Structure formats: structure tokens, C-alpha cells
Design a protein with these regions (language model features):
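Predominantly a Rossmann-like dinucleotide-binding segment in NAD(P)-dependent oxidoreductases
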Residues: 41, 154-160, 165-289
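Residue-level detector of conserved catalytic or cofactor/ligand-binding positions
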Residues: 313-330
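Short, mixed charged/polar active-site loops
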Residues: 307-309
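Short beta->alpha connector loops at strand-helix junctions that form conserved
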Residues: 135-137, 163
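Active-site beta-strand termini and strand-to-loop segments that position acidic
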Residues: 298-304
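Conserved PLP phosphate-binding loop immediately N-terminal to the Schiff-base lysine helix
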Residues: 140-143, 169
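Short, small/polar residue-rich loop motifs at catalytic or cofactor-binding pockets
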Residues: 294
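N-terminal glycine-/serine-/threonine-rich beta1-alpha1-beta2 phosphate-ribose binding loop
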Residues: 2-134, 143-146, 150-158
Length: 331
């Protein structure tokens, strides 16, 4: 006897929500059996992903959650443009996402919020038997990482980092070459992320991407929260951009694992210089001391002997005409 399957049991049997959403044919589900995806965080990244979700006819977004009414207004225009029903809105304070996850019948939730909220939102979703796709990073501490793993294993809910670099065509091509043995035994891999983000971290408080040197409460969009990490932390803030593609090539967590690392940064100069160059020495932000060094270099030792070197620069690169540069090498 053939056993019928509904949307929820189908998603639970899939490897990850992202795969189910991106590769299944659009006519797989009946109109009453569409995947129900909630969105937490409707900023510029959330708006872009909402558009991609709504491009699929087998996906509905019945609910969204955000505390910024400006961003909610912007994402609602995406629904209107695509002639989709206006979603239910949860915007009653920073903890209202818990109400959404507890009350709504969702197959999955996509999270694009300030980084410190990723972990509690992922945990809350999985506790409510909802699969999760979260923007990077999924966690800020080792304990939070293990918390995500333990909760996923206990609840049976998937938790996926939406590391888009892993799915670049060139990256996947090299991964296939590695698995086919084209390069022989790998001994060392390098990953780098060089992206001048100063125009993202500072703006005029009215729009994104430059035009001023404000951040925090006076900033707009990502500058409201993202820049503070550069004030408080000295670290590789984007390890998965470099490490994500390398990990499957070295079979990390598939018979190999990372054992220990050393990480060193240069002095911090670029952020302060940007403020002075664009706001003057008299601007209050010119006096702020940033902990994040301009260049961060990390070397990782693996259990099977390989080494990994990661390089991060969110300030400047050698070619000013190329504001984003992601490089990889395998040896």
C-alpha cells in the first residue's frame, strides 16, 4: 500500500530545507500543500531572500517578524509586486519571534537578523519543530555552537547555515575535482575574504551604503548593529566564507576535524581613517577605538595532518576597483 505524504513529513525526510526549496520542481506540491516559510528579519538581506522565496510557486510566506517598521514597509512591497497575500506581522518587541514560532504552523524559518539573535532564534525554532536556515554566523561562542547541535539532534529539526559561497559554481567544481582525486592527497588549503565594508558599516542614517559616518542608533540598516562588533571584537568575523568551501574538501566532520588554531590580527587603522576622511576629526565617532584589526590571519591544524590558512580583511584590498575579493587555494 502506498503511504501518502504531506508537506511537513516530506520536509522532515529531506536533507535540508534549502535543498527542498531550491531543487524541487515547482509543480511538486498542490496549492494547498505549499511549503510554509516564516521570515525573521526583513532588512535588505531579508528582503532579497523573501523575493527569491516568493519567486517559487510551491512556497508561501504566511508570517514575517521584525522590529523595524521601515523594513516591514519595504518588504511588504515585495509581496505586493509579486501579487502575493500580505503576511501576518509580528513586530511587538525583540522577543516577539518566540510568539510567531510557537503559534504559527511553519515548515521552516529563515533568519536574517543581527548576529547575536541568530542562536536564540534558531533554538526557539527547533524547539517548536521548525527547520531553520540562518544567515552567518549561526552562533558567536563555542557553547552556542554545541547548543545548536544538541538541540537539532534532540528535536530532529535541521539547522542550516546559509553560507552562499559553498554553492558557487566554481567552488562546487573544485570540490568535485577534489573528490575525484584530481589533486591527489590534499595537505594545505587557503581561504580568504577581502571585502571593503566601510560603506556598509557607516552611512548618513537615512539610507544604506555610505554617505556619512554614522552607526548604532544613528545609523541605517546594517550600520545600526553590525559596526558595533568592530568596536567590541577583534576576530575573524566571517570564518565560514573561507572555511565553508574548504571543510568538505578536507572531509571536516566526515572523518577529519579541526584540532587547534592560532589567529593574529594587525593593528586597527582603516575604520578610524574612514571616519576622519569622510566626517572630519571633529566628528564624535572619530574618537572611537575599534578593536577589529585591519587584517586577520588564522592557521588551523586538522586531525589528519592538513593545515588551513584563512585571511580576513574588511577594510581594503590591493585593487581598489575590486571591492569584493574571495580567494581559495588547495595544495
Amino acid at each position: 500500500m502506498t503511504k501518502s505524504i504531506n508537506r511537513r513529513s516530506f520536509v522532515k525526510s529531506a536533507t535540508i530545507i534549502g535543498a527542498a526549496v531550491s531543487i524541487m520542481p515547482s509543480n511538486l506540491f498542490a496549492s494547498s500543500n505549499k511549503l510554509q516559510i516564516g521570515v525573521i528579519g526583513t532588512g535588505l538581506r531579508g528582503q532579497w531572500m523573501t523575493k527569491l522565496f516568493l519567486n517559487r510557486k510551491d512556497v508561501d510566506i504566511p508570517v514575517i517578524c521584525d522590529i523595524d517598521d521601515r523594513m516591514i514597509d519595504m518588504v511588504l512591497k515585495v509581496f505586493e509586486k509579486q501579487n502575493r497575500p500580505i503576511p501576518k506581522i509580528y513586530n511587538n518587541g525583540p522577543e516577539d519571534f518566540r510568539n510567531m514560532l510557537a503559534k504559527e504552523d511553519l515548515d521552516g524559518v529563515y533568519i536574517a537578523t543581527p548576529w547575536e539573535w541568530h542562536h536564540p532564534m534558531c533554538i526557539s525554532a527547533m524547539e517548536n519543530n521548525i527547520h531553520v536556515g540562518t544567515e552567518v554566523p549561526a552562533a558567536l561562542t563555542v557553547n552556542e555552537c554545541w547548543d545548536l547541535v544538541d538541540t537539532s539532534e534532540r528535536t530532529g529539526s535541521f539547522c542550516m547555515i546559509m553560507e552562499n559561497v559553498n554553492y558557487r559554481r566554481d567552488i562546487m567544481a573544485v570540490l568535485n575535482m577534489v573528490r575525484d582525486g584530481l589533486f591527489g592527497e590534499l595537505i594545505h588549503c587557503q581561504g580568504g575574504y577581502q571585502h571593503d565594508l566601510r560603506h556598509v558599516k557607516f552611512n548618513d542614517g537615512k539610507g544604506p551604503y555610505g554617505g556619512g559616518v554614522e552607526f548604532g542608533e544613528k545609523g541605517f540598516s546594517e550600520a545600526r548593529w553590525r559596526t558595533q562588533h568592530s568596536v567590541d571584537r577583534n576576530a575573524d568575523l566571517y570564518p565560514t566564507h573561507g572555511l565553508g568551501p574548504i571543510s568538505p574538501m578536507l572531509n571536516i566532520n566526515r572523518g577529519n576535524r579541526m584540532m587547534h588554531l592560532t589567529s593574529t590580527s594587525s593593528q586597527s587603522r582603516g575604520l578610524n581613517k574612514y571616519i576622519i576622511d569622510n566626517g572630519g576629526t571633529s566628528h564624535p565617532n572619530a574618537k572611537i577605538k575599534f578593536k577589529l584589526g585591519d587584517i586577520v590571519t588564522t592557521v588551523i591544524k586538522c586531525a589528519n595532518g592538513q593545515t588551513i590558512m584563512l585571511s580576513l580583511s574588511l577594510i581594503h584590498i590591493s585593487e581598489p576597483t575590486r571591492p569584493l575579493y574571495i580567494s581559495y587555494a588547495v595544495f
